[in-house]
């Protein structure tokens, strides 16, 4: 539910921005969103003793050289008692920024390390396939195979060695 409301705020916010303001506001939202990782901030935001304007002004004070648009946006969110949506709004804004720039990031996970050349080749092939700039982060874990995830594009490709072994065994048993 929070994501749906966040999308509406982001859509309205984007319509009010020029291309120059877009990146700056994205960074400001990201900075405020990172502050939400602190438990004390949640206490301040949820406190009934602090006025909505004071909450918005406090969040605005966390930013250096912030734009007037972010201040007005924070005041609007505070007035509607939706300051708690800022992390979701930031995430959605980041996604919209990626769509605008045709630049997406994904994860490659598996129990082995890919070489830089292999990673670059995968990035180039996926970039060509989707017509966008794709960057991958390589994560080594216990997954016996390889899994490629592009959440923003809704793509997940996986190859499991265990599954391959099971299917080969099943095929051999059927053949006998």
Curated annotation (Swiss-Prot):
One of its GO terms (molecular function) is proton-transporting ATP synthase activity, rotational mechanism. It is a peripheral membrane protein. It is found in: Cell inner membrane. Pfam families: OSCP (PF00213). One of its GO terms (cellular component) is proton-transporting ATP synthase complex. Keywords: ATP synthesis, Cell inner membrane, Cell membrane, CF(1), Hydrogen ion transport, Ion transport, Membrane, Transport. F(1)F(0) ATP synthase produces ATP from ADP in the presence of a proton or sodium gradient. F-type ATPases consist of two structural domains, F(1) containing the extramembraneous catalytic core and F(0) containing the membrane proton channel, linked together by a central stalk and a peripheral stalk. During catalysis, ATP synthesis in the catalytic domain of F(1) is coupled via a rotary mechanism of the central stalk subunits to proton translocation. This protein is part of the stalk that links CF(0) to CF(1). It either transmits conformational changes from CF(0) to CF(1) or is implicated in proton conduction. Belongs to the ATPase delta chain family. F-type ATPases have 2 components, F(1) - the catalytic core - and F(0) - the membrane proton channel. F(1) has five subunits: alpha(3), beta(3), gamma(1), delta(1), epsilon(1). F(0) has three main subunits: a(1), b(2) and c(10-14). The alpha and beta chains form an alternating ring which encloses part of the gamma chain. F(1) is attached to F(0) by a central stalk formed by the gamma and epsilon chains, while a peripheral stalk is formed by the delta and b chains. This is ATP synthase subunit delta. It comes from Campylobacter fetus subsp. fetus (strain 82-40). The gene is atpH.
